[in-house]
Amino acid sequence: MLRLGHRPQRDKRVTTHVALVARAFGAKGIYIHGNDQKLAKKIEDVINVWGGKYFRIEMISNPKKLVNDWKATGGKVVHLTMYGINLPHVQEKLKELDKILVIVGAEKVEGWYYHMADFNVAISNQPHSEVASLALFLDRVYKGEELNIMFGDSKISVIPMERGKKVVRNDGQH
């Protein structure tokens, strides 16, 4: 996935949440437009403890090149925007795609991205959070299976409970 226009001082919390949702809901990695090594370290720390070493985080300076290269290798680009076609109307087509680059913006997104996207997809045509958009999009594309992801390389795990909280170290100790 691609996070466009990350502004370290203004967007650090939301971009962190976008990356966490991407990882937890099955994305293979995130490209962040900009340079924020503190954010990259935060996500790498989460991966180190909670698992998912396959998840890559990469800071990039030229997102248009990434989009062009992605499309040149047969990938499809999905731009999440409130101005797009509502997800229920395109979700079956999206489930058939193999290589998807999902774009979410931090600041106003240039028209170029709307034109280059294979799909401009709305999660309702109302303003709301890009974190919510990404979560709902991944849930629909992965048909809910992302909720069953087990990170075999995690150092700790949550044991689901009706009441209370239980976290275990994966070396067998509590």
Swiss-Prot record:
One of its GO terms (cellular component) is cytoplasm. Its main location: cytoplasm. Its EC number is 2.1.1.206. GO terms for molecular function: tRNA (cytidine(56)-2'-O)-methyltransferase activity. S-adenosyl-L-methionine binds at residues 80, 105-109, 123-130. InterPro entries: Alpha/beta_knot_MTases, tRNA_m1G_MTases_N, tRNA_mtfrase_aTrm56. The keyword Methyltransferase applies. Keywords: Cytoplasm, Methyltransferase, S-adenosyl-L-methionine, Transferase, tRNA processing. It comes from the Archaea. It is an enzyme of class 2 (transferase). It catalyses: cytidine(56) in tRNA + S-adenosyl-L-methionine = 2'-O-methylcytidine(56) in tRNA + S-adenosyl-L-homocysteine + H(+). One of its GO terms (biological process) is tRNA nucleoside ribose methylation. Transmembrane segments: none annotated. The keyword Cytoplasm applies. Specifically catalyzes the AdoMet-dependent 2'-O-ribose methylation of cytidine at position 56 in tRNAs. HAMAP family: tRNA_methyltr_aTrm56. Homodimer. Belongs to the aTrm56 family. This is tRNA (cytidine(56)-2'-O)-methyltransferase.
